[in-house]
Curated annotation (Swiss-Prot):
Cellular component GO terms, alphabetical: cytosol
Region (Disordered): 691-747
Keyword Cytoplasm: yes
Positions of the S1 motif domain: 623-691
Protein name (database record): Polyribonucleotide nucleotidyltransferase
Catalysed transformations (reactions): RNA(n+1) + phosphate = RNA(n) + a ribonucleoside 5'-diphosphate
Residues reported in the UniProt entry to bind Mg(2+): D487, D493
EC number: 2.7.7.8
BP GO terms, sorted: mRNA catabolic process; RNA processing
HAMAP family given in the database record: PNPase (MF_01595)
Cofactor(s) needed: Mg(2+)
InterPro entries per the UniProt record, alphabetical: ExoRNase_PH_dom1 (IPR001247), ExoRNase_PH_dom2 (IPR015847), ExoRNase_PH_dom2_sf (IPR036345), KH_dom (IPR004087), KH_dom_type_1 (IPR004088), KH_dom_type_1_sf (IPR036612), NA-bd_OB-fold (IPR012340), PNPase (IPR012162)
Amino acid sequence: MFNEITKSVTWNGKVLELSTGKIARQADGAVTVKMGNSVLLCAAVVANKAKEGIGFFPLTINYREMAYAAGKIPGGFFKREGKASDREVLVSRLIDRPIRPLFHPAFVNETHVTCTVLSYDPETPVDILAIIGASAALSLSPAPYLEIVAASKVGLIDGEFVLNPTLELLKTSQLDLVVAGTADSVMMVESEANLLSEEQMLEAVKFGFESFQPIIKIIKELAKEAKKPKFQMQDLYPASLKKEIEKLFVKEIKQAFAIKSKQERSTNLDLIHEKVLTHFVSDIENKKYSNYQIESALKSIESDILRNEILEKNRRIDGRSTTDIRQIACEIGLLPSAHGSALFTRGETQSLVSTTFGTSLDEQLVDSLDGEYKERFMLDYIFPPYSVNEAMPMKAPSRREVGHGKLAWRAINPILPNKVQFPYAIRVVAETTESNGSSSMATVCSSSLALMYAGVPIKAPVAGIAMGLVKEGKKFAVLSDILGDEDYFGDMDFKVAGTSEGITALQMDIKISGVDFKIMKAALEQARLGRLHILDQMNKIISKPNSKLGKNVPSTTTIKIDKDKIRDVIGPGGKVIKEICETSDAKIDISDDGTVSVYASDRDKLKVALDKIKAIAVEPEIGEIFNGTVMKVLDSGAFINYLGTKDGFVHISEIAEERIETVGSVLKQGDIVKVKLIGFDNKGKAKLTIKNADKDKSSNNPKQKNNVNNSKENSEPERRDSSKKRAWNEDNNSDTTEVITERKYFN
């Protein structure tokens, strides 16, 4: 019944198996990929006819992670997989980028590739298997897929490169890099790095490139045995058509490309396109040429003009040399109500960023095959149509926006402080208000500026730059800070972000074969120099984080309590914690390990909530000093309430240094006094003293005398040594910690 063909290879100690002919047999190409306990089905379908009137290749990649693959039922109200998650979108783009340039340029048939995770093994990189499976499925299909792609993941642990590291290993890795390519060339690189050098990044790419060569071999073997006949393709347009257009219109096209303004240049080129189509209207009606052929020939002429100017004259369409970077302008703090804001402008590309701080309750909950986790740092990239002067409606985030946002996220994430150093959730919203090339790298720059202005103690400023390439034969030119047209007509889009010390993110897409490591090395070095120049310009505005947070940033404190006390703080049905939140107007988040995070709009509200939590969860130490309230006066002494829920007794002999006749002559019900815990009686009740409590060095206000006052202040716990930033139970070897974020991070 089945004519199954299987090819396998041992890869990094595991067997990778590709098979076809058993599942999804009606698809033009279908491959099942197995490695460890991971199983993926990759199916490719190609329309029989070209799509009329379309000016691009309609390739769609869909990567899907089914919950059952990890033995789970989808969370939420609907127990079925819905729209693609950000992770699925990002992997779909990861598959698309190395594959798209390898189709015949004249091929415009609708093509769909679906990669479905059927079984998930966290020990194997399913995103890498999806790229391999998609490439194999297309190689079996009739689509004119000209070369075969494979991919690998590279980590860097203890100075050694690791092939296809597990999720657990990636937690300690200095690098998370995906590289894809053919037998001859690297086609795509995507990475996040912890301040690695250009040399380390290049070696990682080489390591990954060499590692996937055996995979290309077995895909070729599978395709040779099982593939279907390929579509026979003709040239994109007749050579005579291009010559005729050049003869009639090349002078006008060159004049248009001499215009430095993007909008003016685009308007002039659009008019020329209309003029050319009008000239060939009879040929279009007679079906001698199609609109697509004419447009393609025009684009080829435009490409020749742009590329020749660069290679022959070292001159770009805006007048710059290959290494020049456009003029830069930076501004910070322009949005008064935002916690942090910045505007970064580089030529005709501009990014406006706002930074907002939230509580741990505001962190993004992510449901994945590996389980649920929270993202503390969120970066949303927005590309409104007006940024390129297009009249279009605003829609849900596109795949491009998700991808660009994640690239900027990777660039910023390595330099952020950890949660102990900075306990806030951080959301960065980056709106591209103008775009003419490299808007994602402008987002990196503006995000770095906004975070520093907001007071986030980042390790170092970060900048990003997009590099391009024009290559003809052995002659090539690497372009710094590319324009949109240079990206479109060029051979490479190479984005590099990092600090002055090293790279934090790298993304490379190559459109041609033959880009060797010599070219990549030159591009990385040129990018380093460009990045340093941009950082110099940014540092003129702000070079390190502000020492204080803004006035409208919520105050926060984090303490740790015993796990056994969590239930007491929460109370039955959440009654206690709700009461604390309502009376203090604060937000409280309690982790399973006993970490309690308290957030409030000001310090007073924060203190009220914190006092109530400590009153419930913290056992006082002997020697601790508190503000207490006199609850009842007796002949022998007085009962004092402290920490809100705790009571102790002060004997008459412990009220004053001198002898007093009656307790009532000194204390009255409702008085606020300082008391020190001196011990417990045989029934466990607290014994307190008022004598010398105000003279103890631990008093928060040692100059204040312990006079009776009738103010209605909230009882406030105090510590024996206020100079020590310790928590309540440190003397008992507790791991309690308290972090107050209204402080200076830099001296």
